[in-house]
Design a protein with these regions (language model features):
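Claisen-condensing/thiolase-fold acyl-transfer catalytic domains that form or cleave C-C bonds
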Residues: 1-98
Length: 98
């Protein structure tokens, strides 16, 4: 229903979306017969994402999580996929459900 992806490195989001849509990448790198598919751009960071909230270093994850939880509460239902970087080339993902 909702994708909240920390876009401090916006090129990473664009590359990931392109990879998910690519039959060749999904077949050769992920061993899938079909692509993962496209992310509905209207469901991606609908409130502007972490850059829009000021990219607070050290608190981005909490801000992204809190924002997604608030959006799900306003809708009364749904799921959100969250992804944030943790520095040093690492990242964390989570799925919220209401």
């Amino acid at each position: 229903d909702l994708f909240e992806i920390h876009e401090a490195f916006a090129a990473q989001i664009l590359a990931t979306m392109k990879a998910w849509e690519s039959p060749e990448f999904c077949r050769e790198r992920l061993g899938r017969l079909e692509p993962l598919g496209a992310i509905d751009r209207g469901k991606l960071n609908p409130k502007g994402g972490s850059i829009a909230i000021g990219h607070p270093f050290g608190a981005t994850g909490a801000r992204v999580l809190g924002g997604a939880a608030k959006q799900l509460a306003a809708r009364g239902h749904g799921r959100a996929l969250l992804s944030v970087c943790t520095g040093g080339g690492m990242g964390v993902t989570a799925i919220l459900e209401r």
